[in-house]
Design a protein with these regions (language model features):
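Compositionally biased, intrinsically disordered low-complexity regions enriched in proline and serine
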Residues: 3-6, 41, 71, 86-88, ...
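Post-signal-peptide N-terminal segment of Sec-exported extracytoplasmic proteins
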Residues: 1-13
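Surface-exposed amphipathic alpha-helical segments
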Residues: 2, 129-155
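Conserved polar/disulfide-associated segments of primarily extracytoplasmic proteins
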Residues: 10-122
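Stable alpha-helical elements in mature extracytoplasmic
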Residues: 4, 66, 70, 74-78, ...
Length: 155
């Protein structure tokens, strides 16, 4: 089963991300980032997390940046970000994933390790107008991100 964050917990999460690191560069980037968590859920066993982040790219970037380009940018940046949060052996590869009835969505496959625990992430990118949506599916110990993606479907 899954436990979804309440509106109050989401507000806390959106305001407290920078508290999770001592890295000044990460804190500054988070302060300037117009991204917000729209959904956050944790599996009842604590071994899986999924979230949806929405970012307003603005009129200029929103018109020219594709989800594929956004995935490529994220792939280049995610290793540094996870390393700043204490992860080791971080790999990030631009790929594609089937998601919510759409085939081959731009995505980033991530693996990392922290305190002996493996982390697997699939970051899937979608875009509507000037907004990019990143659906992050994260599992610990074993990679079940493809199975997690199947939990989403088009309405």
């Amino acid at each position: 089963g899954w436990v979804f964050y309440t509106a109050e917990q989401m507000a806390e999460l959106n305001g407290a991300l920078a508290d999770g690191t001592d890295n000044a560069d990460v804190k500054a980037a988070l302060a300037d980032d117009p991204s917000i968590f729209d959904m956050y859920a944790v599996s009842t066993d604590g071994l899986m997390v999924m979230n949806v982040v929405i970012q307003n790219l603005g009129l200029v970037s929103g018109a020219v940046v594709s989800p594929q380009e956004y995935a490529e940018i994220a792939s280049a940046e995610v290793a540094d970000t996870l390393t700043a949060y204490g992860y080791e052996n971080v790999t990030a590869q631009t790929t594609a994933a089937d998601f919510a009835g759409t085939e081959s969505c731009p995505a980033v496959a991530v693996t990392a390790e922290r305190d002996g625990t493996a982390l697997y992430e699939q970051m899937i990118y979608l875009k509507t107008g000037n907004y990019v949506y990143c659906v992050t599916l994260c599992s610990f110990k074993e990679d079940v991100t493809a199975e997690m993606a199947k939990l989403f479907y088009a309405l």
